[in-house]
């Protein structure tokens, strides 16, 4: 499982995770710097990029001597200075590959920092997305189906207690479990599902449905919101079948599942 952390400065991680912030940063495969106004972040990025050796020359001249002495000395300089980082123009980025040490052909490479500028600078979206996508639409209007939208990560939690052999380690693991218990999310009630469906209607997520389907959905939501009239399971099933938006369909399926459970408890009174 991969995560993308989008930050304005490293201090945001430190504020949320305190002492674990350093470990989180160190475990990130790539650090992509676009722009920041935080001095500590700029300094850290500049330091992470590394240093280079610069050979300097100095001469000792005298009017009374014909032999001028030239001395050389080695100085250490940042590969990219904090001042340069603070003055990035739009499109420039600095890539630090902390853990990724292979090129596109899977060959081993040294993870030198990459400064993307001029020809390799980051383009605007209209410069390359316009050929494949309608950029006039808002990103929220694009229906992207996802199988794990409603995934509860606690369902994937694995208890390692049976795998630990060392008694001391097992005791420490139990202690850590007790101090940081896994909290299961409470099941969503009908009010939350109805509220979510109303929000999707306001976003016009069902605009591709027929006018009749749109009206039936709105009426069903209004009946519950104003008079607490529970939707009929047949009506919800019909809307699921004719809904074109996957997100709306997912919420309707949750609503149907909850209505069936209530129907069983009340002995079929919900549909009457």
Curated annotation (Swiss-Prot):
CDD domains: TrwB_TraG_TraD_VirD4 (cd01127). Gene3D superfamilies: P-loop containing nucleotide triphosphate hydrolases. InterPro entries: P-loop_NTPase, TraG-D_C. It comes from the Bacteria. Keywords: Plasmid. It holds the Pfam family TraG-D_C. This is Uncharacterized protein pXO2-15/BXB0014/GBAA_pXO2_0014. It comes from Bacillus anthracis.
């Amino acid at each position: 499982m991969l995560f993308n952390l989008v930050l304005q400065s490293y201090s945001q991680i430190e504020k949320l995770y305190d002492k674990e912030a350093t470990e989180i940063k160190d475990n990130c495969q790539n650090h992509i710097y676009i722009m920041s106004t935080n001095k500590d972040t700029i300094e850290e990025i500049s330091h992470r990029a590394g240093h280079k050796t610069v050979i300097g020359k100095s001469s000792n001249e005298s009017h009374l001597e014909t032999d001028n002495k030239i001395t050389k000395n080695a100085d250490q300089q940042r590969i990219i200075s904090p001042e340069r980082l603070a003055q990035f123009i739009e499109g420039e980025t600095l890539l630090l590959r902390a853990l990724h040490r292979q090129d596109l052909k899977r060959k081993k490479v040294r993870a030198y920092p990459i400064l993307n500028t001029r020809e390799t600078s980051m383009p605007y979206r209209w410069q390359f997305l316009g050929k494949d996508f309608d950029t006039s639409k808002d990103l929220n209007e694009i229906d992207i189906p996802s199988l794990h939208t409603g995934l509860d990560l606690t369902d994937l939690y694995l208890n390692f207690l049976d795998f630990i052999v060392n008694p001391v380690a097992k005791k420490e693991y139990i202690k850590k479990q007790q101090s940081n218990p896994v909290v299961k999310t409470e099941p969503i009630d009908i009010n939350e599902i109805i509220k979510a469906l109303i929000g999707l209607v306001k976003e016009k997520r069902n605009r591709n449905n027929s006018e009749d389907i749109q009206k039936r959905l709105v009426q069903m939501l209004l009946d519950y919101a104003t008079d607490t009239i529970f939707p009929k399971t047949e009506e919800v099933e019909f809307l699921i079948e004719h809904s074109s938006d996957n997100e709306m369909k997912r919420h309707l399926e949750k609503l149907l599942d909850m209505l069936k459970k209530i129907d069983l408890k009340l002995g079929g009174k919900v549909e009457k």
